[in-house]
Amino acid sequence: MARWGTIYSRAVSVPVYEQRNQPEGVPPLALTGERTLPDIPEENYWFRRHLVVYEWIAARVQDLRVLDLACGEGYGSDVLARTAASVVGVDANPEAYEHARLRYRRENLRFERGLVATFSAPADAVVFLQTIEHLADPGAALEHARSLVGEGGVVFVSTPNVGTLAPKGASRSDNPWHVHEYHEAEFEQLCAAHFATVSMYGLFHARKLRAHDQALRLGWDALHPRLRLTGRFYEWFTPAIATSDFLLRAGGDAPLRRALDFLAVCRP
């Protein structure tokens, strides 16, 4: 993980960090860059950036049967289970599955090990976050998700905005796990090819992250190395980031080309 001078970049090639302070009997997961994890202070920016979308969705799936496809560590499935009638978290990775199964326990929550493309169970809502950029055939995955909810259901799909994720002047990020990264129009068109209605949202910085962005524009990233403040500042700042430091906005209310991530709310 890169320090925050290049604040929002990630070093994804070496699993340097591991989850800390896990409950007894729960094996910690190593951070590889393929998925975000809680309980790693250096990863907190990315964890909160993903968590806030789960919290937003949880407020909209009350009393529904929910599938969380490619659920990873399981934290998002746990958030959804606070409001949903039932949640099934699905992931193909054996370590992630075992960790999630042991760590997150609710009567209305269970985890299954399986492939996104083949897992089948009736649902009112499918949650499919930060995964489509990893797939060689995203259309097939969306079609499968649509078939799981049927008429009257809803599918939530998110992906990074390559326009803000990639380094300046580059056509994509350096994340080796990503097969294809999307601009707004391309992502919306992909979803619209499989759903009758698609409502687009964008995730943006808020509160102290907006203030940090402004500081960068004023030259903070050039100044703090000279003052030898980089390490000390970000050792405090990064763990202090909260979900309230992000904001989801509807496409009609904000220029989504500047969003961090896109969220498509799709209905058959």
Would you name each region that the model predicts?
Residues 190-215:
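Substrate-binding/catalytic lobe of Class I Rossmann-like enzymes that use SAM or dcSAM, i.e.
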Residues 179-194:
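Short alpha-helix
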Residues 80, 145, 191:
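Class I S-adenosylmethionine-dependent transferase superfamily signal
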Residues 139-151:
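A short glycine-rich, Lys/Arg-flanked "PGG" loop and its adjoining helix->strand segment in the class I
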Residues 2-121, 125-129, 139-142, 177, ...:
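Conserved N-terminal segment of class I S-adenosyl-L-methionine
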Residues 157-180:
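Short, glycine-/aromatic-enriched active-site segment of Class I SAM-dependent methyltransferases
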Residues 130-134:
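Short catalytic micro-motifs in class I SAM-dependent methyltransferases
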Residues 135-139, 159:
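A structural helix-start
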